[in-house]
Amino acid sequence: MAVLKPVRLGVNVDHVATVRNARGGALPDPVRAAALAKAAGAHGITAHLREDRRHIRDADMERLKAEIDLPLNFEMAATDEMVAIACRVRPNACCLVPERREERTTEGGLDAAGQRAELAPRIARLKAAGIRVSLFIAADPAQIAAAAELGADIVELHTGAWCDAVTEGRHVEAEAEFVRLKAGARQAAGLGLEVHAGHGLDYATAERIAAFPQIVELNIGHFLIGEAIFVGLDQAIARMRAAIAAGRAAVGDGAAA
């Protein structure tokens, strides 16, 4: 078996901005959090500029690109406004996600199969600007196939349903979701897509999914920012990196077969 590269950790700083915006003003600064994440060994920074600007602001995205020497993953809705902003900021990648104003967080995956007409020109415009395109989707065969057909470079598999089932002790459902994720990772890699995963991951679930040999990157935010309240961001990231490394090491032990 070929030696696998370590799984990259992308740190999402959205919820530093959530705390800032709860009171207004400039603090805590999500760009400072991104700098601390880099110092702690993060491989990339993720931030979601929502249409309602509930946490990350336009200026945050511009500063993250200008001040943080790490790949920037710009999460956004597939709208003309967001595509124009992304083409100006020029992040390393854009991850297209579904958005509903009434949701507290991104609740489901993008319907790539059902929104081809809307997605295709926006994906093409981002790629023409030299931006890699990722689609945040469920581990569903039709969605993964659509992502490849649309010309996406990456799929980020939505791990939220699995993580919720694990946390709530719904063991049968958790195992079924895990099997779906494993099959989805295999399908996506087989179609030439780079495979990422994220949403709801903690130390234990990140370790387990890092054992999928197809996984290249995990994007984690809310859990790490919550842990940082108690142990500091550097320690939270260090422990997460160790968990991910342990999961990747399990590939050689046959745990991901």
UniProtKB/Swiss-Prot annotation:
It is found in: Cytoplasm. It holds the Pfam family PdxJ. It catalyses: 3-amino-2-oxopropyl phosphate + 1-deoxy-D-xylulose 5-phosphate = pyridoxine 5'-phosphate + phosphate + 2 H2O + H(+). Pathway: Cofactor biosynthesis; pyridoxine 5'-phosphate biosynthesis; pyridoxine 5'-phosphate from D-erythrose 4-phosphate: step 5/5. The record marks E156 as: Transition state stabilizer. The active site is at H48 (proton acceptor), E75 (proton acceptor), H199 (proton donor). CDD domains: PNPsynthase. Transmembrane segments: none annotated. Keywords: Cytoplasm, Pyridoxine biosynthesis, Transferase. GO terms for molecular function: pyridoxine 5'-phosphate synthase activity. 3-amino-2-oxopropyl phosphate binds at N12, R23, G200, G221, H222. Gene3D superfamilies: Aldolase class I (3.20.20.70). GO terms for biological process: pyridoxine biosynthetic process. Its main location: cytoplasm. 1-deoxy-D-xylulose 5-phosphate binds at D14, H15, R50, H55, T105. Its EC number is 2.6.99.2. GO terms for cellular component: cytosol. Catalyzes the complicated ring closure reaction between the two acyclic compounds 1-deoxy-D-xylulose-5-phosphate (DXP) and 3-amino-2-oxopropyl phosphate (1-amino-acetone-3-phosphate or AAP) to form pyridoxine 5'-phosphate (PNP) and inorganic phosphate. Homooctamer; tetramer of dimers. Belongs to the PNP synthase family. This is Pyridoxine 5'-phosphate synthase.
